[in-house]
Design a protein with these regions (language model features):
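Short amphipathic alpha-helical segments enriched in hydrophobics
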Residues: 69-72, 288
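A hydrophobic C-terminal alpha-helical subdomain
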Residues: 231-291
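Oxidoreductase cofactor-interface core, primarily capturing Rossmann-like NAD(P)-dependent enzymes
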Residues: 2-42, 53-56, 63, 73-84, ...
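Cofactor-binding loops of NAD(P)H-dependent oxidoreductases
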Residues: 50
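A generic alpha-helix structural signal
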Residues: 59-62, 213, 252, 281
Length: 291
């Protein structure tokens, strides 16, 4: 069973690699810096060193794979994030078109079902469509808002402030990336699916940002209050940080385009994962703020 894993050092990919190894599978990992791989796993995986933005590297590295787990590596701060995401995925799509790849599991996002108007998520929607057109077996995992996004504002949380441009009273699904890794590994190891499938990964429950602030207050042992900002406020901050216009709109659009979103896949047994935000925050966020 030949399985390729991209971004194997990330929150999701590292979990996938560990689970595949525990299942007796030696995955082929595409990684820019092998030193960042988990030391215990490094000697047990097939390492292909290169950059996912190098089309030739990707084309060669995925050739002959039974399955590929694809994670778009494009940073939201890229000069043209949507174009970069599509260009980066192009060699995978080409490999699927000519039969060099049999199955793809794509890390997508809720919001991709809208196809347009959701900022950088529009790129994932387009990648979904391009993979669908190849005719290979493809699974689009439309994932919820990552718990780990909270790690991007440790400075604010250290002051007891959670900043957001989302509607504070609108419930949305939140998920632990490790739970996504569990779903990915199970799908990669299974031969029981084929064709085009979409599966949401919604975490254990939908939460409003007001609820998140209360959960963090308890888990972190400190008062956490919401700081609501407007889309224009986010734009101003991103411009001040030097981000180019396409990146600014790609980031703002992900929030603005998701405010009224009702995910295409309803919450159900198949979409619900176990890890709750409070436990995750106590175990992973609190030590960082107390250190």
């Amino acid at each position: 069973m030949s399985i390729v894993v991209t971004t194997p050092t990330g929150h999701v990919g590292s979990r996938v690699v560990r689970l595949l190894l525990q299942a007796g599978v030696r995955p082929r990992v595409l990684v820019r810096d092998p030193a960042r791989l988990d030391e215990a796993a490094r000697a047990q995986v097939d390492v292909r060193r290169g950059d996912l933005t190098d089309a030739g590297f990707v084309r060669d590295a995925v050739a002959g794979a039974r399955s590929v787990f694809w994670v778009d590596p494009t940073p939201h701060s890229a000069a043209d994030p949507i174009e970069t995401s599509l260009r980066t995925a192009a060699p995978l799509v080409e490999a699927a078109q000519v039969g060099d790849v049999k199955r793809v599991v794509l890390l997508s996002s809720i919001g991709a079902e809208k196809r347009h108007g959701v900022g950088h998520i529009d790129a994932l929607a387009a990648i979904e469509e391009r993979l669908d057109a190849t005719g290979v077996d493809v699974l689009h995992l439309r994932c919820a808002y990552f718990f780990t996004n909270l790690l991007l504002d440790l400075e604010g949380l250290s002051r007891g402030v959670l900043t957001t441009a989302f509607d504070p009273d609108h419930p949305m699904p939140w998920v632990d990336p490790r739970d996504i890794g569990d779903v990915v590994a199970a799908r990669l190891l299974s031969d029981a699916w084929q064709g085009r499938l979409v599966q949401a990964v919604h975490g254990p429950e939908d939460l409003t940002f007001n609820q998140v602030a209360r959960i963090l207050t308890e888990a972190l042992g400190r008062q956490v209050r919401l700081n609501l900002v407007s889309d224009d406020g986010v734009r101003d901050a991103l411009r001040a940080a030097g981000l180019p216009p396409s990146a600014v709109e790609g980031i703002v659009g992900m929030t603005a385009g998701s405010r009224d979103l009702v995910p295409e896949q309803p919450r159900a047994l198949l979409t619900t994962t176990p890890t709750r935000l409070g436990g995750w925050a106590h175990a992973h966020l609190r030590p960082l703020l107390e250190g």
